[in-house]
């Protein structure tokens, strides 16, 4: 609904001006990561350490597999030079906690095992994604700053807007609400979706003002084939790799969804932090995340139904 409203009236999304919009976007990021920290289960996460081989192979494959696919697509000309950096950033995102756990359980897999790997992946993301940004992606051009200055700006932002909110969310859950009511659980699970939708709303509204509807529509058409085909290839390789990592069906299904799903909850906030909320190029980084999220939600649900049979 918010994206539809941004398409109809994009001026409303930027009516507060760049300063107010940027401050509100940072506030939303803090709330999102506070709630992500509130939902983390460190005790369950540590259970995946029982098998160090599967632990590290899975965590490496979560990033290495999509990165290899993106680079292969670029090498054969499916992904253009202009789209390479946004696609690499997308490939380096962690697995999503919510959908991979839901799909794993729905397909008869080990949902708790998926939760452990997804939790660890999301904890590592605030460190790995900025490293990938500077050492793998490193976009060039006047809109971006030198690496030393970027590190001095992005690392504090990651600590203040990601690390501390996650820690305080985890601490608040442990110290204040160790046994939350169902309503609190529901709010913690759904409020981040509202925050993500608002961030996407601001990004789309800003893009429509800067680039116009026709260019945005053309962007969607251009991205649909590489993202849709990329999701199918990632799913194929994820199923193959999951069979090598785990022999039992429950573990294999859980590993498959961990490898094949990317996090919108971390993706959009991290794009805002790395690119900058007022960057004229923000849309080209955010839109692939949004479009892939829709593709993987629909595709993941269909795969879940197939695996359930």
Residue ranges of model-derived segments:
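Alpha-helical transmembrane segments of multi-pass small-molecule/ion transporters
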Residues: 1-309
């Amino acid at each position: 609904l918010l994206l539809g409203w941004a398409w109809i009236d994009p001026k409303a999304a930027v009516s507060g001006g760049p300063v107010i919009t940027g401050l509100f976007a940072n506030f939303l990021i803090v709330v999102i990561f506070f709630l992500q920290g509130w939902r983390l289960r460190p005790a369950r996460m540590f259970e995946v350490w029982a098998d160090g081989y599967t632990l590290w192979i899975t965590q490496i494959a979560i990033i290495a597999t999509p990165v290899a696919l993106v680079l292969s697509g670029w090498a054969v000309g499916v992904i253009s030079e202009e789209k390479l950096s946004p696609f690499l950033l997308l490939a380096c995102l962690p697995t999503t906690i919510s959908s991979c756990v839901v799909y794993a359980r729905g397909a008869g897999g080990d949902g708790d095992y998926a939760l452990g790997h997804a939790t660890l992946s999301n904890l590592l993301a605030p460190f790995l994604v900025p490293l990938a940004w500077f050492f793998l992606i490193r976009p060039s051009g006047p809109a971006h700053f030198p690496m030393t200055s970027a590190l001095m700006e992005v690392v504090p932002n990651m600590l203040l807007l990601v690390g501390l909110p996650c820690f305080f969310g985890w601490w608040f859950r442990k110290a204040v609400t160790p046994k939350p009511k169902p309503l609190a659980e529901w709010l913690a699970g759904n409020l981040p979706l509202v925050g993500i939708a608002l961030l996407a709303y601001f990004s789309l509204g800003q893009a429509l003002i800067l680039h116009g509807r026709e260019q945005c529509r053309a962007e969607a058409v251009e991205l649909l084939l590489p993202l849709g085909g990329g999701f199918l290839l990632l799913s194929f390789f994820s199923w193959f790799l999951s069979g090598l990592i785990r022999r039992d069906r429950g573990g294999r299904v859980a590993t498959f969804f961990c490898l094949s799903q990317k996090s919108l909850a971390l993706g959009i906030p991290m794009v805002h932090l790395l690119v900058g909320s007022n960057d004229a190029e923000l849309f080209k980084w955010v839109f692939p995340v949004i479009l892939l999220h829709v593709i993987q939600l629909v595709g993941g649900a269909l795969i879940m139904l197939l695996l359930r049979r």
